[in-house]
Amino acid sequence: EVLWDIGAGSGSISIEWCLGHPKNVAFAIERRRDRISLIKANRKKFGLQERLTVKHGNIETIAKDLPTPNAVFIGGGVTSDLIYQVIKVLGKNSRLVINAVTLESQALLLKKYKQFGGNLKKINISKPKPIGGKTIWSAQYNIIQWSFKT
Protein backbone atom coordinates (compact mmCIF):
# COMPACT_ATOMS: atom_id res chain seq x y z
CA GLU A 1 0.00 0.00 0.00
CA VAL A 2 0.99 3.63 -0.56
CA LEU A 3 1.24 6.21 2.25
CA TRP A 4 1.54 9.97 1.92
CA ASP A 5 3.11 11.30 5.13
CA ILE A 6 2.47 15.06 5.01
CA GLY A 7 4.47 17.12 7.49
CA ALA A 8 6.73 14.11 7.94
CA GLY A 9 9.02 15.63 10.60
CA SER A 10 11.48 12.84 11.43
CA GLY A 11 9.89 10.32 9.07
CA SER A 12 8.81 8.00 11.90
CA ILE A 13 5.30 7.41 10.51
CA SER A 14 6.69 6.58 7.05
CA ILE A 15 9.30 4.27 8.56
CA GLU A 16 6.75 2.39 10.67
CA TRP A 17 4.48 2.11 7.61
CA CYS A 18 7.25 0.56 5.52
CA LEU A 19 8.31 -1.78 8.31
CA GLY A 20 4.70 -2.91 8.75
CA HIS A 21 4.63 -4.84 5.46
CA PRO A 22 7.39 -5.61 2.92
CA LYS A 23 5.32 -4.24 0.01
CA ASN A 24 4.34 -0.95 1.68
CA VAL A 25 5.86 2.24 0.27
CA ALA A 26 5.78 5.76 1.68
CA PHE A 27 6.26 9.31 0.47
CA ALA A 28 7.50 11.57 3.26
CA ILE A 29 6.60 15.15 2.36
CA GLU A 30 8.17 17.94 4.39
CA ARG A 31 8.35 21.72 3.88
CA ARG A 32 11.20 22.34 6.30
CA ARG A 33 14.57 21.73 4.70
CA ASP A 34 16.26 21.06 8.08
CA ARG A 35 13.98 18.06 8.60
CA ILE A 36 14.70 16.54 5.18
CA SER A 37 18.22 15.48 6.21
CA LEU A 38 16.83 13.91 9.40
CA ILE A 39 14.24 11.90 7.44
CA LYS A 40 16.94 10.73 5.00
CA ALA A 41 19.24 9.70 7.86
CA ASN A 42 16.43 7.75 9.54
CA ARG A 43 15.48 6.14 6.22
CA LYS A 44 19.08 4.96 5.77
CA LYS A 45 19.28 3.72 9.37
CA PHE A 46 16.35 1.36 8.68
CA GLY A 47 17.47 0.41 5.16
CA LEU A 48 14.37 1.82 3.48
CA GLN A 49 15.97 3.80 0.63
CA GLU A 50 14.02 1.78 -1.97
CA ARG A 51 10.59 2.13 -0.33
CA LEU A 52 10.60 5.52 1.39
CA THR A 53 10.77 8.51 -0.95
CA VAL A 54 11.52 11.90 0.61
CA LYS A 55 10.02 15.01 -1.01
CA HIS A 56 10.82 18.59 -0.03
CA GLY A 57 8.05 21.13 -0.58
CA ASN A 58 4.30 21.58 -0.36
CA ILE A 59 1.86 18.78 -1.09
CA GLU A 60 -0.05 21.16 -3.37
CA THR A 61 2.81 21.09 -5.88
CA ILE A 62 4.04 17.55 -5.24
CA ALA A 63 0.73 15.62 -5.27
CA LYS A 64 0.41 15.45 -9.06
CA ASP A 65 3.65 13.42 -9.27
CA LEU A 66 2.69 10.87 -6.59
CA PRO A 67 0.75 7.61 -6.90
CA THR A 68 -2.76 7.54 -5.44
CA PRO A 69 -2.47 6.89 -1.70
CA ASN A 70 -4.16 4.12 0.25
CA ALA A 71 -3.52 6.15 3.39
CA VAL A 72 -2.58 9.73 4.23
CA PHE A 73 -1.17 10.94 7.53
CA ILE A 74 -0.96 14.66 8.25
CA GLY A 75 1.31 15.37 11.17
CA GLY A 76 1.66 19.13 10.87
CA GLY A 77 0.47 22.18 9.00
CA VAL A 78 -3.12 21.02 8.59
CA THR A 79 -5.56 23.42 6.93
CA SER A 80 -9.11 23.06 5.67
CA ASP A 81 -7.87 23.37 2.08
CA LEU A 82 -5.31 20.62 2.64
CA ILE A 83 -7.97 18.29 4.03
CA TYR A 84 -10.22 18.87 1.01
CA GLN A 85 -7.32 18.35 -1.39
CA VAL A 86 -6.41 15.05 0.24
CA ILE A 87 -10.00 13.77 0.40
CA LYS A 88 -10.33 14.42 -3.35
CA VAL A 89 -7.43 12.09 -4.18
CA LEU A 90 -8.26 9.28 -1.77
CA GLY A 91 -9.45 6.11 -3.43
CA LYS A 92 -12.13 3.73 -2.20
CA ASN A 93 -11.34 2.18 1.21
CA SER A 94 -8.55 4.69 1.83
CA ARG A 95 -7.71 6.23 5.18
CA LEU A 96 -6.90 9.74 6.36
CA VAL A 97 -5.39 10.29 9.81
CA ILE A 98 -4.54 13.74 11.18
CA ASN A 99 -2.86 14.66 14.47
CA ALA A 100 -3.21 18.17 15.91
CA VAL A 101 -1.65 19.82 18.95
CA THR A 102 -2.59 23.50 18.52
CA LEU A 103 -6.02 24.74 19.56
CA GLU A 104 -6.61 26.08 16.05
CA SER A 105 -5.82 22.75 14.41
CA GLN A 106 -7.82 20.87 17.02
CA ALA A 107 -10.85 23.10 16.38
CA LEU A 108 -10.50 22.40 12.67
CA LEU A 109 -10.47 18.64 13.29
CA LEU A 110 -13.62 18.89 15.42
CA LYS A 111 -15.31 20.77 12.57
CA LYS A 112 -14.25 18.15 10.00
CA TYR A 113 -15.34 15.32 12.30
CA LYS A 114 -18.82 16.87 12.51
CA GLN A 115 -18.85 17.37 8.73
CA PHE A 116 -17.48 13.99 7.55
CA GLY A 117 -17.79 11.64 10.52
CA GLY A 118 -15.02 9.19 11.23
CA ASN A 119 -13.29 8.84 14.59
CA LEU A 120 -12.07 11.58 16.91
CA LYS A 121 -9.70 10.82 19.80
CA LYS A 122 -7.88 12.83 22.43
CA ILE A 123 -4.52 11.37 23.38
CA ASN A 124 -2.91 12.47 26.62
CA ILE A 125 0.72 11.67 27.24
CA SER A 126 2.47 12.18 30.57
CA LYS A 127 6.02 11.48 31.66
CA PRO A 128 7.31 10.87 35.18
CA LYS A 129 9.00 13.86 36.81
CA PRO A 130 10.78 14.00 40.18
CA ILE A 131 9.41 16.45 42.73
CA GLY A 132 10.36 16.71 46.41
CA GLY A 133 11.86 13.22 46.53
CA LYS A 134 8.75 11.72 44.95
CA THR A 135 7.54 11.29 41.38
CA ILE A 136 4.57 12.89 39.64
CA TRP A 137 3.13 12.66 36.15
CA SER A 138 3.99 15.71 34.07
CA ALA A 139 1.51 16.26 31.23
CA GLN A 140 2.86 16.72 27.72
CA TYR A 141 0.93 18.04 24.72
CA ASN A 142 -2.62 16.82 24.27
CA ILE A 143 -3.06 15.39 20.80
CA ILE A 144 -6.37 15.34 18.97
CA GLN A 145 -6.51 12.69 16.26
CA TRP A 146 -9.16 12.53 13.55
CA SER A 147 -9.35 9.51 11.28
CA PHE A 148 -11.63 9.09 8.29
CA LYS A 149 -12.16 6.20 5.88
CA THR A 150 -13.62 6.52 2.39
Describe the predicted segments one by one.
Residues W4, F27-E30, N99:
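The conserved SAM/SAH-binding core of class I Rossmann-like methyltransferase domains
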Residues T53-I98:
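Active-site segment flanking the S-adenosylmethionine/decSAM binding pocket
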Residues Y84-I144:
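C-terminal substrate-binding/active-site "lid" region of AdoMet-derived donor-dependent transferases
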Residues H21, L48, L90-K92:
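Helix-to-beta-strand junctions that scaffold the AdoMet/dcAdoMet cofactor pocket
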Residues S10-K23:
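Conserved SAM-binding loop of SAM-dependent methyltransferases across substrates and taxa
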Residues I29-A71:
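S-adenosyl-L-methionine
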Residues V2-G9:
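Conserved class I S-adenosyl-L-methionine
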Residues V2, V25, R95:
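Short glycine-centered segments of the SAM/dcSAM-binding site in methyltransferase folds
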